């Protein structure tokens, strides 16, 4: 079972980067946010002609943008307006309501910051290197290092020099 996408707004988009790992039963909610600042949260305007002229409900906080090399765990839910940075990890069954920085690990309901995967200097290097944009032949050559913890070796590898 792949991701489920609920969309209440044709203008709100889901953008997913390259080489992402998406577990089963993820839910992306594009819009459909109930207005907590209105007297009722019920969508009368969507169901009754008397409210058809009233806009703004349900609402959207914007596009969902998932960066490159992101892992989203089983049964997670991502709300509209969220950007998930490159290399981030979303723990299983997390409810993501806010942006997630690159290479951060978040988990829970609502999702909270757990830790960064790497020191900031390494994150900056990975962001600048953007290996996910390399030609696929170069990525294939780099697989032994991509699937390792040899970070320093990865940054000095011949594959890096050919990009």
Spans of model-derived segments:
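Extended beta-solenoid/beta-helix repeat architectures
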Residues: 83-84, 100
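Conserved catalytic-core motifs of eukaryotic protein kinase domains, centered on the activation segment
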Residues: 32-33, 100, 116-117
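Conserved acidic donor-binding loop of glycosyltransferase catalytic domains
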Residues: 91, 97-98, 114
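Flexible, glycine/small-residue-enriched loop-and-beta-strand segment within the central core
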Residues: 1-80
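C-terminal segments of enzyme domains that contribute to small-molecule binding surfaces
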Residues: 44-78, 110-163
């Amino acid at each position: 079972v792949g991701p489920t996408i609920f969309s209440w707004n044709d203008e709100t988009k889901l953008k997913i980067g390259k080489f992402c790992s998406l577990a089963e039963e993820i839910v992306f909610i594009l819009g459909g946010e109930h207005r907590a600042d209105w007297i009722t949260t019920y969508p009368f305007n969507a169901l009754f002609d008397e409210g058809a002229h009233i806009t703004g409900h349900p609402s959207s906080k914007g596009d969902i943008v998932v960066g490159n090399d992101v892992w989203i765990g089983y049964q997670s839910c991502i709300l509209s307006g969220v950007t998930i940075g490159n290399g981030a990890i979303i723990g299983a069954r997390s409810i993501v309501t806010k942006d997630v920085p690159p290479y951060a690990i978040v988990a829970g309901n609502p999702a909270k910051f757990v830790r960064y995967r790497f020191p900031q200097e390494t994150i900056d290097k990975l962001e600048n290197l953007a290996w996910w944009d390399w030609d696929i032949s170069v990525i294939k050559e780099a697989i032994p290092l991509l699937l390792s913890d040899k970070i320093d070796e990865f940054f000095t590898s011949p594959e890096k020099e050919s990009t």
